[in-house]
Every structure is written in C-alpha cells, then in structure tokens.
Amino acid sequence: MQIILLEKVANLGNLGEVVRVRDGYARNFLIPQKKARRATDAALKEFEARRAELEKVQAEKLAAAQALAERLNGFQLKISQKAGVDGRLFGSVTNADVAEGLRKAGFEAVEKSQVRMPNGQIKAVGEYLVQAVLHADVVADVVVLVEGEMA
C-alpha cells in the first residue's frame, strides 16, 4: 500500500515522503496513529496544501522533545524494591516502573513505550543506564539506581 507519512517514522521515512508498506502495517498501526494517510491523488493535493502547517507541528514536537531531553539527560532515578540478602530483587524493575518513577519526578511526558532497557528488565540491586526515546531523533539517557529493601 502506498502511504504519505505525516511525521517522521523510524526506519521508514520523513514527513511528506510517499512510501510503500505492507497493508496490515498501514491499516493497523500507521493510519490509526495518524502517522500516515493513503496516497491517493486527493490526499496528495491536500497534503501539499497543509505541508507547511504539518512541518511547523513537527518542528514544535522536536523542540519540546529536545527541551525535555536536556532536563532528562543524566537524571538519576531511585527505585526501591524488595531484595534478598544477595542483592537479587524479588520481581524486577520494568520500563513501566521507570516511566512511573519519572512521572512522579515531574517528567509527565515520558510513557512506558518510550523507555528502552538495553539489557532487559532489571533483576538486581545496582546502577543501570536506561534510554528514553522521546522522538525519532531525540534519545535521553537516565541513570536508574535500584535500592534493595529487606523483605
């Protein structure tokens, strides 16, 4: 299916590009998320008329993400979990826990789908580096300090 991208999509293209994707990817993800439209003649004409407006919105989103990344880079988030004597956690720290901790710390815009944990879930006490993907071009590094509570 031919689609017009309404914003930058990772591994696919930039705003305004006409790309070919699988039908299911377009119908089930890109179009419902308002990241793309079908590439019909009418849609292309309408897009060209609204191009400047869409580019302005994209620039505002990018600027907001960069401002948040400046505040978030190097931020240390402390999370307490019940742990055993050997330092292993009862359970684990997930991206949802990190996102909730960031929300409580005042970073309301960070959602769990934006938190990337390179080594998977955290299962031991210690200091870990986690990434927050705020925009296709903006990534912030957050230090997560996992402290153990005696059970």
From Swiss-Prot:
Gene Ontology molecular function, alphabetical: rRNA binding; structural constituent of ribosome
Coiled-coil positions: none
GO cellular component terms, A-Z: ribonucleoprotein complex; ribosome
HAMAP family for this protein: Ribosomal_bL9 (MF_00503)
Family per record: Belongs to the bacterial ribosomal protein bL9 family.
NCBIfam families noted in UniProt: L9 (TIGR00158)
Role: Binds to the 23S rRNA.
Official protein name in the record: Large ribosomal subunit protein bL9
Source species: Bordetella pertussis (strain Tohama I / ATCC BAA-589 / NCTC 13251)
